[in-house]
Amino acid sequence: MALLPDKEKLLRNFLRCANWEEKYLYIIELGQRLPELRDEDRSPQNSIQGCQSQVWIVMRQNAQGIIELQGDSDAAIVKGLIAVVFILYDQMTPQDVVNFDVRPWFEKMALTQHLTPSRSQGLEAMIRAIRAKAAALS
């Protein structure tokens, strides 16, 4: 996650964008910073149902009990949304993930009101899947 900003810097950078075109470009840029997902991780068990695009999210727990997320999508904007979600959950334990509400962050960014309904549903599906995977680990 060293290539991605922390939550506060994400919000600052997002709010600095002059308009929604710049914000979409920033989201896409964040997606381009995600590490490449291995082919073997593009499996049905890592596939997120409820997304219009193909989305894969892998969750592992490191030796310190912190979750590590990896993901990819076949759509640039969705890959960027994956990066945004990963930033919000960075350095958390599985229990932290289960308890953390991302909605206030999305509201500060005015994110969901500028996404199409299908993208918003896909974003919710990603969050549900991450929380379910975290609950299984906690």
From Swiss-Prot:
Any matching Pfam family: SufE
Name of this chain's protein: Cysteine desulfuration protein SufE
Superkingdom of origin organism: Bacteria
Compartments where located: Cytoplasm
Primary localization class, coarse: cytoplasm
Gene (name only): sufE
Family, per entry: Belongs to the SufE family.
Pathway named in the protein's UniProt entry: Cofactor biosynthesis; iron-sulfur cluster biosynthesis
NCBIfam families linked to this entry: PRK09296.1 (NF006792)
Annotated function: Participates in cysteine desulfuration mediated by SufS. Cysteine desulfuration mobilizes sulfur from L-cysteine to yield L-alanine and constitutes an essential step in sulfur metabolism for biosynthesis of a variety of sulfur-containing biomolecules. Functions as a sulfur acceptor for SufS, by mediating the direct transfer of the sulfur atom from the S-sulfanylcysteine of SufS, an intermediate product of cysteine desulfuration process.
Active site: 51 (cysteine persulfide intermediate)
Subunit structure and binding partners: Homodimer. Interacts with SufS.
Example of a GO cellular component annotation carried by this entry: cytoplasm
Gene3D superfamilies: 3.90.1010.10
